[in-house]
Amino acid sequence: MELAIFSKTYKGNAEEIFQKMNNQKLNYCHFNLANIGMDMIPDYIDYDKLNNLNVLLKKYNIKLIGLSGTFNMIDCDKENKEKNIRNFEILCEIANILHVKTISLCTGSKSKNSKWEWDDENETTESYNEFLETMKCLLEYAHKYNIILSIEPEASNVINSARKARNVLDHFKDEHIKIIMDAANLLNMNNYNDQDTVIIEAFDLIGNDIIEAHAKNFNISDNKIKFVAPFNGKLNYELVIKLLNKYNYKGTFVMHALEENEVDKSIKYLKENFDALY
């Protein structure tokens, strides 16, 4: 597995980001359109910016493994949710222009503060069904533009476990839906001490459906899970990488939840400790 990184890890414009990636010998990037001055899910196509991005990708030999499309799929603000659903078609068309096959999603939360913050209403049947309805809308675009939609079981979202992600896959039975495996996102204050069991069960359920794997870590601070750079936490990386290999994952390992000044140390840690990474 080669290492990759989120474009928003870096400060600067796209050319500056790709220069930094070259200096760190990183060739793969999960990209956010905000890095070229566009909305993540824009309401129009800026062909000049996209054409310039394609030129830079070729110049610096950077490959985009995915685009971010993470709006709140069960947003309490119905008008905002509907706008994002409509504009998602534009993002799919942009993905085609950039030769990107995968768009990442956030399954969402009923929290009024953040789509990444837990709300007890996430556990209701109504929230789950609302997510399914949003997913159904996005799948129409995915089919039209031949895009894979990647969902991520995340402890603060409506799809907050590998079992629920499995249920989504079984509900739709659609090759345009795949999984982002971020082991740290499976953990919460109730299960992190039993992380090996949680991670093994997750791979048993969804290990054959992984399209993208994320590399971040976690610590406990103020009785909460805090996400940190790959080199700095409690995650059993040895187990995660062993399971990615067991399930024949062929994609990249995308560094996540780190500051720009932590990238070099994260690369060093991952490459020196795990032979599967290069």
Please identify what each model-predicted range represents.
Residues 30-54, 107-113:
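Glycine-rich, proline-tolerant flexible connector loops at the mouths of alpha/beta enzymes
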Residues 2, 29, 67, 133-234:
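Acidic/histidine-rich catalytic cores of soluble enzymes
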Residues 44-51, 81-89, 121-125, 132, ...:
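Charged helix-capping and loop-helix junction motifs
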Residues 1-12:
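Boundary/entry segment of secreted carbohydrate-active catalytic domains
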Residues 9-11, 33-35, 71-73, 107-111, ...:
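Active-site-proximal loop/turn and secondary-structure-junction residues that shape catalytic pockets
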Residues 263-278:
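C-terminal helical cap(s) of enzyme catalytic domains, especially alpha/beta-barrels
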Residues 16-19, 58-59, 76-179:
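Active-site acidic/histidine proton-transfer and metal-coordination neighborhood
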Residues 18-25, 45-65, 89-99, 139-144, ...:
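Acidic (Asp/Glu)-rich catalytic clusters
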